Amino acid sequence: MTPRAIICLAGPTAAGKSASTLALAQRWPLEIINVDSATIYRGMDIGTAKPSAAERAQVPQHLLDIRDPAQSYSAAKFRADALRLIAEIHARGRIPLLAGGTMLYYKALREGLDDLPQADPALRAELEARAARLGWPALHAELALLDPATAARLSPNDSQRIQRALEICRLAGQPMSALLQGERRGDAPSPYRYVTLSLEPSERAALHARIAQRFDAMLAAGLVEEVRGLHARPDLHPGLPSVRCVGYRQMWSYLDGDIDLDTAREQGVAATRQLAKRQLTWLRAQPERVIIDCLAGDAVARTVDAMARALPD
């Protein structure tokens, strides 16, 4: 029996996923499962480009505003939530659409998860303190000695991934790259096949321009004030996944007095471009990928046509 197809609308940041999602919802009885590790947080709306109240009124949306910024959320939890929601949406006679750009979540849903050790808050605090003294490039050099394969694919300033790789080395007693080559953990195989409608730019420079324009629009909409509200909370700090989100960590550094606003803006745009590059690298390796030029004037119409072809009769 052929597994039931689940449609994923994916693409790099600023590719226009939200506009396409709303157009699809006008044609089919959809419910959206958001695949985004930032929009899960309450009070983080501007910098995450979270759907507005008006947009949410047009189509049911799941996995938005489900965590306080002080709380954690994992790929394993997303997988469990998404599989539950897919079944519930099917039971209502509606169509689930996975939409977003957190590629680790898609990977977890499709393939299950590797048996890696859980995060250790004390160890993370120790690594962050060392990074504050020495800089992340120094910790990247340390990682290169412990796990050369992982270090080779990470930027010396990729703080989140360097921290996680060092954490795994310490907790597991072996490199993350070795663990990733080992046995998968006991997740049941996904009962579905996944078809990815992939919004990708035909010109990188044009996407970069979009990213800069969008970041400036977020600043104009009040991003600094949004982050200021988070910054005032004593329970939030730069080590949390919420604060490490692109845009938020740069504004946090500005509010800490470490950099000026122009530098924070430049760093935020650069970090968003790097995120888009990683997203595109992952997308290009996906099976059953239908490419749609997100820069085309009729990109939304093309997405609707691709959805019509991808859905089972």
From Swiss-Prot:
UniProt keyword Phosphoprotein, yes or no: no
Name of the top EC class for this enzyme: transferase
InterPro entries for this protein: Dimethylallyltransferase, IPT, P-loop_NTPase
E.C. code: 2.5.1.75
Catalyses which reaction(s): adenosine(37) in tRNA + dimethylallyl diphosphate = N(6)-dimethylallyladenosine(37) in tRNA + diphosphate
GO biological process, one term: tRNA modification
Residues the record lists as binding ATP: G11, P12, T13, A14, A15, G16, K17, S18
Domain of life: Bacteria
Cofactor: Mg(2+)
Chain residue ranges for the region called Interaction with substrate tRNA: 36-39, 160-164, 244-249
UniProt keyword list: ATP-binding, Magnesium, Nucleotide-binding, Transferase, tRNA processing
Disulphide linkage map: none
GO MF annotation list: ATP binding; tRNA dimethylallyltransferase activity
Chain segments annotated as transmembrane: none
Positions annotated to bind substrate: T13, A14, A15, G16, K17, S18
Annotated positions for site Interaction with substrate tRNA: T102, R124
Main function: Catalyzes the transfer of a dimethylallyl group onto the adenine at position 37 in tRNAs that read codons beginning with uridine, leading to the formation of N6-(dimethylallyl)adenosine (i(6)A).
Subunit structure: Monomer.
UniProt similarity note: Belongs to the IPP transferase family.
NCBIfam families: miaA
Protein name as catalogued: tRNA dimethylallyltransferase
Organism of provenance: Bordetella parapertussis (strain 12822 / ATCC BAA-587 / NCTC 13253)
